[in-house]
Structures are given as structure tokens and as C-alpha cells.
A protein has these predicted regions:
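Catalytic nucleophile loop of clan PA
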Residues: 180
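Generic cytosolic/nucleocytoplasmic N-terminal low-complexity/intrinsically disordered segments
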Residues: 2-3, 15
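Cys-dependent protein tyrosine phosphatase-like superfamily
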Residues: 17-177, 191-289
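General helical secondary-structure elements
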Residues: 1-2, 22
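Ser/Thr-glycine-rich phosphate-binding loops at phosphate-binding pockets of nucleotides
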Residues: 183, 187-188
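Sec-dependent signal peptide recognition
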Residues: 3-9
Length: 289
């Protein structure tokens, strides 16, 4: 029973859309200013649930991130043919996958033709699965939160090399990029955060983007909780899983504080912790601003 619950969470796909979204109804932000606003930030996808546009955010010096150049997402293992065509129409040139080897073996990405696939594994999967199993056996909400707080510390201290390579990879060509993990919230959330900080977006606006996961996945979180309770015959209070299924401000603030404590500032972390040069930063800003 616990194994089934684990699979439900990590697949993050208890049900699929019964109808395919018409390709003609999907926004292309880069070429149509009608869609360049918050109402269209979440992309309409059949087989993913947290795929979104990072364009439009303002920097502290008055510039804006270009629309249609940078996307974050959850896993792409269930996307439809129409989804694949949509990603191609968006002009995405590369997909960067932060999932572990085990996650990718279980749910391999469907990569549309003409799009490069790049693996940059961050292996928190095994620990996450153990935590969920422990939760279903009676751990508290507080103990659940501590796992993701610790994970965000590790993004800074243990996986800075991966995130540095990620930022450098974004600037090695001129094309749009999409990056993702499993749920599109923790590993991808930190990747989005450091990218936005490097581009000059304020910390508060970065946190607002981070927190949008809860808004965009609210219905699915409720569905997952209900399904787990049903599968365990209501012998488990699946509510204690809520901190794992969504995001909390404390998670990303912990990552920021860890970086600031060690490096003095977030920009120092990007320069010295991620080994991003001033030339790299200029190239990043030229591409995305």
C-alpha cells in the first residue's frame, strides 16, 4: 500500500485530462503580446501540470525578462502529441532535466523532435520516498517540513556545481530553454530562483514566482491527498503530506539564507558558489533581458 502511495506522489499524475487541448488555443507568448501577462503564465498542457513561462518579470534596474525564452516545468513523461507540438511551436531548443537516474528510468521524458535533452541529476529522490513512507506511518507535519528545509540547504551546499553548470548551459546558445524536475517545485524552483536573481529580479518577486506552484497545482494536491486517504482506507492522515506536495516560503528563504550566510549575498553565491563570471552574467542578461 505504501508503495502505491509513493508511486502516486512521484508520478504526480493520478488522472490525465480527458480531452486534448486544441493546439490552436495555446498561447505563443513570444510573438503575441495579448498573452504577455500573468493570466497566461501557466501553459495549457495535457500531460503536465506546472509548466510555466518566466517572461515578464521586472528587474530592479527597470528591464524585463523576455517572453518566450525561459520555461520551468514538472516532468514531461506524460505529455501528449499536441503538447509536443506546442513545445516545438514555442521554439524551445533544449530541455534540462534535474531528476535522478531512478526517476528518469521510472518516468522517462518524452522529448519532442528537434529539442535537445540535457541531464543534470540532483538526487533527492531516494530520501524523499523514504520520508513519504515514514509520514504515512505517523510522522508529524513538522518533520515533513524539515525534510524540504534541509533539501534547500543542500541545493546551496551540495549541488552548487550542478546549478552553476545549469546557468552556463542557458547561455551556450540563443534558443529558448525549459528546465524541470518531477513536480517542478523544489529542484526546478531553486533553479528558477537563482536564474531570476542573476538576471536582477528582486528577491520578493522571485519568492512570488516560487509560491505560484501552490496556486497552479492546488486542485491536484487536493486530489492526491484524497486518493492517498482512500487507498489507505482513511487510516492515514494524508494532510501531513501537504508540505511535501506544495511549497512554502520558508523553503526558498532557507536556501537564500544559507547562501547569504556562506557567501555574504546571493550575487556573491552566484559568482563564487556557482562560479559564474561577470562575462557569464552579461551573456545571461543579454539573452534573457
Amino acid at each position: 500500500m505504501f508503495k502505491k502511495a509513493r508511486i502516486l506522489f512521484f508520478c504526480f499524475a493520478l488522472t490525465q485530462c480527458s480531452e486534448t487541448i486544441d493546439l490552436m488555443d495555446r498561447p505563443i507568448h513570444k510573438t503575441d503580446s495579448t498573452f504577455q501577462n500573468e493570466d497566461y503564465r501557466l501553459l495549457p498542457m495535457d500531460g503536465s501540470h506546472n509548466t510555466r513561462e518566466l517572461g515578464g518579470y521586472k528587474t530592479t534596474d527597470g528591464k524585463s525578462i523576455k517572453w518566450g525564452m525561459l520555461f520551468r516545468s514538472d516532468k514531461l513523461s506524460d505529455i501528449s502529441k499536441a503538447d509536443q507540438a506546442y513545445l516545438q511551436n514555442l521554439g524551445i531548443k533544449k530541455i534540462i532535466d534535474f531528476r535522478s537516474k531512478e526517476e528518469k528510468a521510472e518516468d522517462p521524458d518524452i522529448v519532442p523532435k528537434g529539442i535537445s535533452y540535457i541531464e543534470m541529476p540532483i538526487s533527492v529522490d531516494g530520501a524523499m520516498r523514504s520520508k513519504i513512507e515514514a509520514v504515512l506511518k505517523g510522522e508529524t507535519n513538522k518533520e515533513v517540513k524539515s525534510f524540504l528545509i534541509d533539501a534547500n540547504k543542500e541545493f546551496v551546499s551540495d549541488y552548487n556545481g550542478v546549478y552553476g553548470d545549469f546557468l552556463k548551459n542557458l547561455i551556450d546558445d540563443d534558443g529558448p530553454a525549459l528546465f524541470h524536475c518531477t513536480a517542478g517545485k523544489d529542484r526546478a524552483g531553486f533553479a528558477a530562483a537563482i536564474t531570476l536573481i542573476a538576471l536582477g529580479v528582486s528577491k520578493e518577486d522571485v519568492i512570488k514566482d516560487y509560491m505560484k506552484t501552490n496556486q497552479f497545482t492546488e486542485e491536484r494536491i487536493e486530489e492526491i491527498i484524497g486518493q492517498i486517504e482512500l487507498m489507505t482506507l482513511y487510516q492515514t492522515d494524508a494532510e501531513v503530506l501537504r508540505p511535501l506536495l506544495g511549497v512554502e516560503r520558508e523553503y526558498i528563504e532557507t536556501a537564500f539564507q544559507t547562501a547569504e550566510d556562506e557567501y555574504g549575498s546571493l550575487m556573491n553565491f552566484i559568482r563564487h558558489g556557482l562560479n559564474i563570471s561577470d562575462d557569464d552574467l552579461q551573456k545571461l542578461r543579454t539573452k534573457f533581458l
